[in-house]
Amino acid sequence: MLRIADKTFDSHLFTGTGKFASSQLMVEAIRASGSQLVTLAMKRVDLRQHNDAILAPLIDAGVTLLPNTSGAKTAEEAIFAAQLAREALGTHWLKLEIHPDARWLLPDPVETLKAAEALVKQGFVVLPYCGADPVLCKRLEEVGCAAVMPLGAPIGSNQGLETRAMLEIIIQQATVPVVVDAGIGVPSHATQALEMGADAVLVNTAIAVADDPVMMAQAFRLAVEAGVMARRAVPGTRSSYAQATSPLTGFLEASA
């Protein structure tokens, strides 16, 4: 069970809505993933009507919607988008994204912290997408963010946990949930993140661009479940030396 702010989730896999070939395929994949929290870019939906091709199927699926501010380049733009989302969708939950450079889509740490502090004061449950910077994540936690979402690698790159060393520090020091976001390309990446101690992962591109998105969503569901189970089982410690799994000489002594 994962708790963030005022909500609890059985699944530790969050999903996105971009890059799917159709809204029907998107919903089928989300259902197959078991995800209960789905993020969507406000710039891609028609907020004036709930029969939007993306929004309507998600509402029907009964998932928790996490609007994001993707496309915002400044704190002011992100705050404006957040206010529109709250008014249109009736949710105070928000994934805060501010990335000024469209080529790399890396989060702006200064603007993200500025916006996060303002949005928390306005009553939002803020989940900021941020770099894998332990100092920044601690600052975001201190201003009241409900979770932090450090990247594993650039958005959509499928590179995996390239920031592993920093993620380990973030996880160790955090007192709010840590959701590894961006760069996860295959199910084993998700398993590794959960084994490290992350509370959840957010996956979009890896599922949406697969030849069979529904099957890939199922694979991620199982991978996340395996990661959570492995962490709870408490793996053995790593050793620089070999450790025998059975006596090496006992049978010789017994036969002597």
UniProtKB/Swiss-Prot annotation:
Subcellular location: Cytoplasm
SUPFAM superfamilies named among the record's database cross-references: ThiG-like (SSF110399)
Gene3D superfamilies named in the record: Aldolase class I
Enzyme Commission identifier(s): 2.8.1.10
Keyword annotations of the record: Cytoplasm, Schiff base, Thiamine biosynthesis, Transferase
Entry's Gene Ontology molecular function annotations: thiazole synthase activity
GO cellular component terms given for this protein: cytoplasm
Superkingdom of origin: Bacteria
Principal cellular location given in the protein's record: cytoplasm
Active-site residues, as the UniProt record annotates them: 95 (schiff-base intermediate with dxp)
General function of this protein: Catalyzes the rearrangement of 1-deoxy-D-xylulose 5-phosphate (DXP) to produce the thiazole phosphate moiety of thiamine. Sulfur is provided by the thiocarboxylate moiety of the carrier protein ThiS. In vitro, sulfur can be provided by H(2)S.
Family, as annotated: Belongs to the ThiG family.
Name of this protein: Thiazole synthase
Organism: Citrobacter koseri (strain ATCC BAA-895 / CDC 4225-83 / SGSC4696)
